[in-house]
């Protein structure tokens, strides 16, 4: 009976290991410029400003590896150049396939409203004023999470933020404060934006919780040794195990044009033997046939090796 109980405990422990591994791995995400569907116009681009704020918040959360926005802009520029036919497509990035990032976050600003009532006039002296002005701000965002391999929309979520200030107050004249400036964060609109961004980070983390960590084959040294993207910055460690899948052609609904994903063929298991900051080396106990650069490596399907 004791032997049987030990066997059951061993099995349960082994099953728990992939989940533990997945929990420590950080998915690589990229944030694109937000589309502005409001009438707001300012000195700073609302689309770029919101994307920068979300990028910073995702980085500060510590839950993701966030692709630098300038790198994303460079990739998009390369894609645009490829689509124009001015470079060979074989040597360029494919639209919708950002190899470095697993998830592309796209956003739309649907509401960006600020209303004021009352007056800031009143007693003024030395550049300061005492007034009784009430300000209310509201912002609405639509966030979409896109699989960069297939272009499939994994989730779509609306988030919003509201803030207000009012009553007797003393302060410097802040009329004309522009989005993205130092004084903006202290305004009702700045606070509303922060609320929406914080909600967006929480929603993104929740939606991606059950999405398996994914990396890419970046080099094939032999049929049993390869290099994968990610490395130490994503939490990959020596001894971690993954499953390799070859990626087939993208499947598209002929009627709607909807991206249905790609056929994935399981090739086998690999174990990480060494780790660098941005990539890792892994080996397989048996030959992996037809593995190529760009194939997918997933976590959570094989057991992580236990420490001796």
Please give the residue ranges for each predicted region:
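Beta-strand/loop-dominated core regions that host nucleotide or nucleotide-derived cofactor-binding catalytic loops
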Residues: 243-308
């Amino acid at each position: 009976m004791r032997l049987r109980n030990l066997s059951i405990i061993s099995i349960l422990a082994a099953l728990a290991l992939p989940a533990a591994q997945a929990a420590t791995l950080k998915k690589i995400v990229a944030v694109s410029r937000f589309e502005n569907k409001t009438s707001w116009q300012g000195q700073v681009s609302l689309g770029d400003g919101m994307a920068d704020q979300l990028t910073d918040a995702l980085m500060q959360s510590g839950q993701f590896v966030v692709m630098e926005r300038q790198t994303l802009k460079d990739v998009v520029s390369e894609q645009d150049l490829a689509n124009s036919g001015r470079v060979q497509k074989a040597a360029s990035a494919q639209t919708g396939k950002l190899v470095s990032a697993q998830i592309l976050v796209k956003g739309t600003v649907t509401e960006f409203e600020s209303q004021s009532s009352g007056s800031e006039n009143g007693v003024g002296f030395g550049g300061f004023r005492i007034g009784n002005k009430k300000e209310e701000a509201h912002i609405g965002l639509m966030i979409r999470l896109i699989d960069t391999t297939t272009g499939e929309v994994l989730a779509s979520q609306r988030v919003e933020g509201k803030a207000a200030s009012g009553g007797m107050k003393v302060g410097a004249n802040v009329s004309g404060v522009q989005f993205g400036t130092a004084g903006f964060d202290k305004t009702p609109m700045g606070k509303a934006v922060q609320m929406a961004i914080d909600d967006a980070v929480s929603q993104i983390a929740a939606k991606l919780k059950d999405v398996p960590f994914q990396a890419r084959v970046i080099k094939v040294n032999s049929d049993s040794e390869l290099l994968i993207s990610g490395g130490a910055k994503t939490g990959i460690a020596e001894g971690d195990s993954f499953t390799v899948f070859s990626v087939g052609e993208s499947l598209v609904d002929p009627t709607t044009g909807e991206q249905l994903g790609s056929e994935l063929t399981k090739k086998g298991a690999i174990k990480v033997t060494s780790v660098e900051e941005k990539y890792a080396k892994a080996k397989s106990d048996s030959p992996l046939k037809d593995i190529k650069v760009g194939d997918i490596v997933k976590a959570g399907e094989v057991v992580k090796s236990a420490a001796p």
